[in-house]
Amino acid sequence: ASADEAKARIADFTARGVPMTTDRVVLTSGTSEGIEIALNALVEPGDEVLVPMPTYPLYTAVTAKIAAKAVYYRTDPACGWLPDVDQIRSLMSPRTRALVVIDPNNPTGAVYPDAVRRELIELASRHGFVLLADEVYGDLAYDGPTPPMARLDLDAPVISFGSLSKAYLAPG
């Protein structure tokens, strides 16, 4: 299949309530490359990226490579590993360029309720930074596929990362 055919099939597969067209799909050699491309496009030296703890180490590695700062927000095990939105709000600064959200989360297994997802999207929209939605495990949640965060606000600045290898249990 051609790249255009692949993009069309990915757009159909990932839509789930988000109007998807091939011009909204970027093919990369893996999610890691997509994350690196997005961060390099969005972040300048000295900027800040809000990153959950625990996190996927690539986010902090790429942020450091850009000479930007990873600002960690907590996910609370006492609250099902959900992010503390008030704490995230307190960590934001004029240099904040992105908010990383890993949902479903690895390694915690947390799947965020729509109310939390909406609050996170609202933060990004209101304060002018991009929400990086790491949704690579979206097809592997115990309760069935997790709808993309972007469906909650089609105008919000959301970049969603998916992974066919994770969806088909063939990572590596």
Question: What feature does the model see in each segment?
Answer:
Residues 66, 126-127, 156:
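Helix C-cap/helix->beta junction micro-motif
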